[in-house]
Amino acid sequence: ALQESLCAVLPFAHLASRQIPRAAEIFDFFADYIGQLAGETYDQLHDYRTVVTRQPAGVAAIFTPWNACLALSSMQIASCIAFGNSCVLKPSEFAPLAVLQLVRLLESVGLPTGVVNVVNGRGSVTGAALATAAGVDRISLTGRGDTARKVMAAAAAQLTPVHFELEGNSANIIFDDADIDRAIDGALVSAFGNSGQICIAGSRILVQQNIADRFIAAF
């Protein structure tokens, strides 16, 4: 939590109470899911049996942003491992230290070297090289829309499937039957949680007209 706080300039209390526990819970979830992986059979057609099995995709290139680097990296790493894949992770150049420590921790408890790899550098150089690498089978990026367009264009040359989670600009909508005090608390947390640097931040507030004056006065 301290390394993430120093790199990303995020509140230590928020990281220690939310993002770090979330990262641990993500690994718990996928560890439990590993035991449930099995083939599926279907008998909906007479004299036919359909069998579905899952196979690893291979190597995933993962790009994570600075504002929740450890939590989002944990989600990508854990899912890769659970489904039998390896990954090359490029964290934001502004917040790489906690991710490096996480990978060292994973290897210290027995994860084979080379399953989870980290490369550091600027997106325009290291990220571009990773997005066009011939040995990459999947690409996942959490970040800005303009970055996603560049990655998608680069991946197209290799026909590499991509997965994006992109920036948002969400609104809190307050109706006249809402508890005003609770709505204000929720709007404040939504707008300024994680120092306001989060893709689900409530950057706008839409209030029903007949309670607008009361809401604004209380806000």
Language model regions located:
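N-terminal Rossmann-like NAD(P)+-binding subdomain of aldehyde/semialdehyde dehydrogenases
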Residues: 1-48
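Beta-loop-alpha module in the N-terminal Rossmann-like domain of NAD(P)-dependent dehydrogenases
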Residues: 60, 67, 122-129, 143-150, ...
